[in-house]
Design a protein with these regions (language model features):
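Conserved loop->alpha-helix
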Residues: 1-84
Length: 84
């Protein structure tokens, strides 16, 4: 369960379209502490960490999540609130 307290912020570094889904690479000071399959709140949306590479981690949002949240507007440089 998330506390609602933002732990840190990240920056969208890369956006990859996969059909109607989007994959995001997020750079943050806590990325190297994350683990694959860990749930992390990204600006209020709970997403599963798919890969960690140094100070970056990868997540994917499906089309419905992109429609019902602000993730559809994320682009490189967008700030992301992170909560574990």
């Amino acid at each position: 369960m998330f506390t609602g307290i933002i732990e840190n912020t990240g920056i969208v570094k890369e956006v990859i379209s996969n059909g109607s889904n989007r994959t995001f690479w997020i750079e943050s000071p806590v990325s190297d502490q994350l683990k694959t399959d860990q749930s992390v709140s990204h600006s209020g949306v709970c997403l599963t960490v798919e890969e960690v590479a140094g100070n970056r981690h990868r997540i994917t949002a499906i089309d419905e999540t992109l429609i019902k949240s602000n993730l559809g507007s994320w682009e490189p440089g967008s700030l992301v609130n992170l909560e574990r």
